[in-house]
Amino acid sequence: KNLATSLQAEYPKDKLHVLVTKSNSNNFTYDGIELGGERTANEVEEEIKILEKDGNKVTKISIVGYSLGGLVARYVIGLLYAKGYFDRIQPVNFTTFATPHLGVRSPLLGPHNYLWNVLGARTLSTSGRQLFTVDSFRDTGRPLLTVMADPSSVFIRGLAKFKHRTLYCNIINDRSVVYYT
């Protein structure tokens, strides 16, 4: 909320609308990237409808995600792109902070890494399976993160529409999203 508050303080209300999505709060984060992305996309679409019903014209969109939220945001972009939103709304900024874009599997450098990969994927529900890339996305037979990285996917084609694509991460002392992710 600090980012939202800072942006709202900097820009006039009639020029900037900030939506802090709520549909994936609390334990809903365990439902996975796909379901979380669908819920968030619905929230974004509803907000756009409300703004336009109130006489506002939505002309640009920027999307920010933190940690798992960055992956959810990438999924949302694919859904919005597939529905044609970017034909009428200009995608400007896509930014993620501490997001494990490559998943969280540890390189197999010893038994503790193997144990982490096995237990993590099985104890963190759908989100864990997707982050550890042991899931199978729909009928593709491939993990969701692999599908989302495919250049021909709606996820990459939608992401490519954004004028600015930025990721921020720590290269040391970040145990939750380590450097190889």
Where are these regions (language model features)?
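Catalytic nucleophile-loop/oxyanion-hole region of alpha/beta-hydrolase
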Residues: 25-36
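Short, surface-exposed "cap/lid" segments of acyl-processing enzymes
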Residues: 1-27, 80
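Short, glycine/acidic-enriched capping/hinge loops at junctions between secondary-structure elements
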Residues: 2, 31-32, 179
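Conserved beta-strand scaffold positions in the cores of enzyme catalytic domains, especially
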Residues: 18-21, 94, 165-167
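Serine-dependent carboxylesterase/thioesterase catalytic core
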Residues: 37-152, 163, 174-176
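Active-site donor-binding loop signature of nucleotide-sugar glycosyltransferases
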Residues: 23, 99, 170
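C-terminal catalytic-base region of ester-bond hydrolases, centering on the histidine
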Residues: 155-181
